């Protein structure tokens, strides 16, 4: 879920909200976002529809696609700084796609240098325990001790199954509250569209590094609400409403 949200948020902020976005893909060795960018470029090359769509988008917003800087947790900040210097780049926001565990080498170093962490949650005991443990350690060891630049760590519900009993979510919400962690109000429903990548065979667009999601696809996805909330807590310019 992390990589998908990184891409969706980056694409909406960059292509629709007019912000200058950079993405650092430091979730090695899988580098899901870098690989997605490669597949996106391939899909555009194979599809006249996507070629026209990309041309029209460029004509309209007059900016190139956001960079995906391939790195690892140890070198992420250094690689970002090098890119900024070499390309003379200016960003309003930089998103980091990190491994989901503090045991990965360099993760603590990188999260110490960033401003906010957002963690998608799933109502599954194993996922919840690891997510909450991650959040609590960061909160206690870094934020509370002022050992970092971090201004906040926020959790949000992902893959919310309407059939799941509300008591399950309510009991986890109490655990989150007791741990004094911040939970966003936005809830992302469990929907197959989050798995849909750009394809030369289909004309609908949802998850892509080159385009924002289609308006038809975004309805009912919970993304608009999530991004408005992200912009509010991070004080990003949210004047370009969705």
Regions found by a protein language model. Give the residues of each.
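Inter-motif core of Ras-like GTPase G domains
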Residues: 105-125
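C-terminal boundary of histidine-terminating zinc-finger modules
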Residues: 196-227
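P-loop/Walker-type NTP enzyme "switch/lid" segment
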Residues: 4, 9-93
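Generic structural signal for small/hydrophobic residues in well-ordered secondary structure
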Residues: 32-33, 115, 134, 188
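Conserved C-terminal guanine-recognition region of P-loop GTPase G domains, centered on the G4
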Residues: 131-147
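Conserved glycine(s) of the Walker
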Residues: 1
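Beta-strand-loop-alpha "switch" segments that mediate conformational coupling across diverse proteins
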Residues: 159-208
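Structural beta-sheet core signal
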Residues: 23-24, 96, 119, 155-157
